[in-house]
Amino acid sequence: MRHYETMFILKPTLVEEEIKSKIEFYKEVITKHHGVIETSLDMGMRNLAYEIKKHKRGYYYVAYFKANPSMILELERLYRINEDVLRFIVIKYESKKEVEAWHALVDRANKKPSHAKEKHEKTEHTHSHHTEETESVGSHSK
């Protein structure tokens, strides 16, 4: 089995149930063809770098998996025929150095919660807002 990473972007117009259904479908494609999903990242709704099919946002999903090369053609075919997939990519890790990098990515993905960045930003925003209030109170007492 070879090491792979896949990422796909779904249309932002899909409801939550449809998104979950699409993600499960592609996970099943990998596992039905004797692939093993090591880890995945549900990156959620994000802005696109440029407009794709009149959409400015998309739902990102990444999976790191091991599979036989013959399965990749079927996975890519299924991405292409699904109108809800805006973009996709499948990356193959071949050399020893690339496989080590793949393992590092898997380890990092397993340690980091999928929405940790959003939680961190909310915490920073709350903290900076609190600091501004404290500074304004202090300046009135002078």
Curated annotation (Swiss-Prot):
One Gene Ontology CC term in the entry: cytosolic small ribosomal subunit
Keywords for this protein: Ribonucleoprotein, Ribosomal protein, RNA-binding, rRNA-binding
Region (Disordered), start-end ranges: 110-142
Pfam families found in the cross-reference section: Ribosomal_S6
Compositionally skewed regions (Basic and acidic residues) per UniProt: 110-133
Keyword RNA-binding: yes
GO biological process annotation, one example: translation
Protein family membership: Belongs to the bacterial ribosomal protein bS6 family.
Free-text function comment from the UniProt entry: Binds together with bS18 to 16S ribosomal RNA.
Protein name: Small ribosomal subunit protein bS6
